[in-house]
């Protein structure tokens, strides 16, 4: 693999640079869907879980035993399941959306395409950035990245990034008389980049994500003539993947 001009790549690719991402990447990967054509990211019940569709191709079931049709890569590392697909990456250098099968370059589970998140590398110079967000529904987000000066004769650079997402529950449960869907995510990453020679580069990154968010709220409703309602369009829970609602004659 090597970097190429996107105009020379014989494939359908959308690429977003850091400037674009800072304006659109508010909380997680769902924000990318609005700036890339043919891409739909549908959040599912589990925290950080999503069913991703490119050109209408997706895997409806997001159980860990199933492989997604659209793959998620972060820094070249494949994320094997739909769980935690909604990355909360803050210091992304760019995000690439490749449409169509990508088995030649990326291997299996890329029938529909893939989303590749490439984070920025340690710069070796002291500096950083911070982003503070306050919004309705008690949303309070803090994101920060710090680069440290290089050591070992300038060959070893390090970087630390941290994210704290809190609040943002906009569902009201009338029965419980409380807000539902509150977000509570704490994550950080430590990255070290070692360049012992001009021809050798070694990067090691440690990530830790603690997601204590509420389970995503869903609506239960019925059609005329139905006794029970199921989660919105997730009838597969009762073995009925083609129809919404649990039909019963009474």
Where are these regions (language model features)?
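Glycine-rich, histidine-containing beta strand-loop boundary motifs that form or position
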Residues: 43-45, 162, 204-206
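Outer-membrane beta-barrel translocator/receptor signature
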Residues: 50, 67-69, 81, 90-99, ...
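Acidic, small-polar-rich N-terminal luminal/periplasmic segments of exported/outer-membrane proteins
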Residues: 1-125
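Structural signature of outer-membrane beta-barrel domains
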Residues: 2-4, 59, 135-137, 165-169, ...
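Short secondary-structure transition/capping segments
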Residues: 53-57, 171-172, 215-216
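Outer-membrane beta-barrel domain signature, strongest for Gram-negative TonB-dependent receptors
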Residues: 177, 182-250
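Residue-level signature of outer-membrane beta-barrel architecture
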Residues: 74-76, 148-150, 192-195
